[in-house]
Amino acid sequence: MSDYEPLRLHVPEPTGRPGCKTDFSYLHLSPAGEVRKPPVDVEPAETSDLAYSLVRVLDDDGHAVGPWNPQLSNEQLLRGMRAMLKTRLFDARMLTAQRQKKLSFYMQCLGEEAIATAHTLALRDGDMCFPTYRQQGILITREYPLVDMICQLLSNEADPLKGRQLPIMYSSKEAGFFSISGNLATQFIQAVGWGMASAIKGDTRIASAWIGDGATAESDFHTALTFAHVYRAPVILNVVNNQWAISTFQAIAGGEGTTFANRGVGCGIASLRVDGNDFLAVYAASEWAAERARRNLGPSLIEWVTYRAGPHSTSDDPSKYRPADDWTNFPLGDPIARLKRHMIGLGIWSEEQHEATHKALEAEVLAAQKQAESHGTLIDGRVPSAASMFEDVYAELPEHLRRQRQELGV
């Protein structure tokens, strides 16, 4: 007889399912203000404790506490609030438009607004972002025209991308927003390469890339970490741990019993684990990582702990795999509500101002939608010309493509 039990595999399970309340104790939260802030020139190995703790600034009463408090000005706080509100309202309006069959597809960032907006405010003009489909807040924070965003969603005759990208896969070189890819984890290797190119040219611009918790299981994630470490690429690598990769719990990607931030430390990269629903913590950690990159101190990996409050996309029904009230029970709360409480406590915001701003931004989004629809909708056939498929690739069109264009008569 064998002295050993039969071998068996471990399959991680979520701590909550429909009809069974989620136990969020697996998150291992740190009290606000208690996590140390190292100097920007810290050795990566000395950030190992920061990869397991949780950087937080806002306490339960809305006070900013601890060494990570970025001491933002009133103007910065107001800009951040407006950017988060506009992002959420834009999402809500586009979700409604999809349900009305005005759009074919949409993806929200509900509950994750602070990650894109605060991070963007901590960057500089010229820094290049390599986003996923939940970082529309970058464009909104950088005041990219809402009309152009909606025209892209509609793929109409005014679509800046001429109908060549799926809805929500925006792109704008001028806004420092690299083309979104539907393939997972491509953002990391692209950003590392861009950052290396910036260094080779002797530039001062840095790169910042985003992926989700599920995409850390892709090989590109590990390849990017290797190159970033070896060449000390000026890049920020953001892992948005929103607990779910479509219907797959984050533990399946390797988050059980450890953190995604810890993978950076193992690769020789300075790493942080941060409350992604704390606007001030997001700004502070982003500013710290950006300073490291800009001072040639190497890359940083940041795990943003948050919660995907909405469905994965308009094709998803999360009620099939998680409790309906999960977001309301998530211990890190709503990023907008938390910043609002802080600003009211400072005396620079009020419920009345919040409501008035909400209405004004809602009207702005609606006006942008109407203007975008004037350039064409899904049903009226006003789309980019067929001739546009021959543009924007070759400086001089090859003979075989000239023949094809002639045959099409465009």
From Swiss-Prot:
Highest taxon of the lineage: Bacteria
Keywords, ordered alphabetically: Oxidoreductase, Thiamine pyrophosphate
GO molecular function terms noted in the UniProt entry: 3-methyl-2-oxobutanoate dehydrogenase (2-methylpropanoyl-transferring) activity
Keyword Nucleotidyltransferase: no
EC number annotated for this UniProt entry: 1.2.4.4
Recorded catalytic activity of this chain's protein: N(6)-[(R)-lipoyl]-L-lysyl-[protein] + 3-methyl-2-oxobutanoate + H(+) = N(6)-[(R)-S(8)-2-methylpropanoyldihydrolipoyl]-L-lysyl-[protein] + CO2
Gene Ontology biological process terms in this record: branched-chain amino acid catabolic process
InterPro entries: Alpha-ketoacid_DH_E1_comp, DH_E1, Oxoisoval_DH_suAlpha_N_dom, THDP-binding
Cofactor(s), names only, from the UniProt record: thiamine diphosphate
The keyword Oxidoreductase is annotated on this UniProt entry: yes
Oligomer status and interactors: Heterodimer of an alpha and a beta chain.
Family: Belongs to the BCKDHA family.
Physiological role: The branched-chain alpha-keto dehydrogenase complex catalyzes the overall conversion of alpha-keto acids to acyl-CoA and CO(2). It contains multiple copies of three enzymatic components: branched-chain alpha-keto acid decarboxylase (E1), lipoamide acyltransferase (E2) and lipoamide dehydrogenase (E3).
Name used for this protein in its record: 2-oxoisovalerate dehydrogenase subunit alpha
Gene field: bkdA1
